[in-house]
Swiss-Prot record:
It comes from Paracottus knerii (Stone sculpin). Disulfide bonds join C81-C158. Its main location: membrane. It holds the Pfam family 7tm_1. Phosphorylated on some or all of the serine and threonine residues present in the C-terminal region. PANTHER family: OPSIN. The lineage of its organism: Eukaryota, Metazoa, Chordata, Craniata, Vertebrata. GO terms for cellular component: membrane; photoreceptor disc membrane; plasma membrane. This is Rhodopsin. InterPro entries: GPCR_opsins, GPCR_Rhodpsn, GPCR_Rhodpsn_7TM, Opsin, Retinal_BS, Rhodopsin.
Length: 289
């Protein structure tokens, strides 16, 4: 044991709680949306994509971590580590790029930079494909030799190896690629879209260009997506910050808890998206009841 057995027991209990909550709420989101035709809108396709991403994390990552925490180390070998790291990375990245697509959709629908543009089912499907392709370009490289997945923190889950700088894995280039393409760029797009969106909402309200009902509906949807983005940042920014600090301070000593806490706090992202969707979408709640 790297830390006390009680810490592994607490970790296992925490993962069990995430599975107990994360699987039902994400499955419920998928089931209710697919069951009720009026919920099958282009925007909701992207929200369904978030639920699928969260289920990847729950089924492919959380169950594995709960099992390994009972043993005090990662007992599933190289293949198990690759699979767990892949599913966790893929799920987190699909969620991030889905939020990018949602931000662009909100900007186009509210800001109207393209006249007479409607966000249709085809656009939503393109957005889904885009999110999966971009997520794969982050999750697949460690499987084929550009960096690798290794047990991290308390050695109960696997993530990308950004701290050993082992020879032959081009650690520096992948970490710079990951932080630039899969963190800074998507967040910059999100902040740009919502910055422009806030300006558009204020201008429309001042000019009374649209009916009050339409404005209220667009504001509610935009507020829901903004809260999802804030939730993503709250969950993943500590992990990204610690990972970057470790990468930039090679040789510095840090304990297993230092890396474990932000990594497992980030996993709560599999719960908050469906809860936000359920709590802030009246139409969904009515269909669910």
């Amino acid at each position: 044991y790297l830390v006390s057995p009680a810490a592994y027991a607490a970790l296992g209990a925490y993962m069990f709680l995430l599975i107990l909550v994360g699987f039902p709420v994400n499955f419920l989101t998928l089931y209710v949306t697919l069951e009720h035709k009026k919920l099958r809108t282009p925007l909701n396709y992207i929200l369904l994509n978030l639920a699928v991403a969260d289920l990847f994390m729950v089924l492919g990552g959380f169950t594995t971590t709960m099992y390994t925490s009972m043993h005090g180390y990662f007992v599933l070998g190289r293949l198990g580590c690759n699979l767990e790291g892949f599913f966790a990375t893929l799920g987190g990245e699909i969620a991030l790029w889905s939020l990018v697509v949602l931000a662009i959709e909100r900007w186009i629908v509210v800001r109207k930079p393209i006249s007479n543009f409607r966000f249709t089912e085809d656009h939503a499907i393109m957005g889904l494909g885009f999110s999966w392709v971009m997520a794969s370009t982050c999750a697949v490289p460690p499987l084929v030799g550009w960096l690798r997945y290794i047990p991290e923190g308390m050695q109960c889950s696997c993530g990308v190896d950004y701290y050993t700088r082992a020879e032959g894995f081009n650690t520096e280039s992948f970490v710079l690629y990951m932080f630039t393409v899969h963190f800074l760029i998507p967040l910059s797009v999100i902040f740009f879209c919502y910055g422009r969106l806030l300006c558009a909402v204020k201008e429309a309200a001042a000019a009374q260009q649209e009916s009050e009902t339409t404005q209220r509906a667009e504001k509610e949807v935009s507020r829901m997506v903004v809260i999802m983005v804030i939730g993503y940042l709250v969950c993943w920014l500590p992990y990204a910050s610690v990972a970057w600090w470790i990468f930039c301070n090679q040789g510095s000593e840090f304990g297993p808890i230092f890396m474990t806490l932000p990594a497992f706090f980030a996993k709560t992202s599999a719960i908050y998206n469906p809860l936000i969707y359920i709590c802030m979408n009246k139409q969904f709640r009515h269909c669910m009841i």
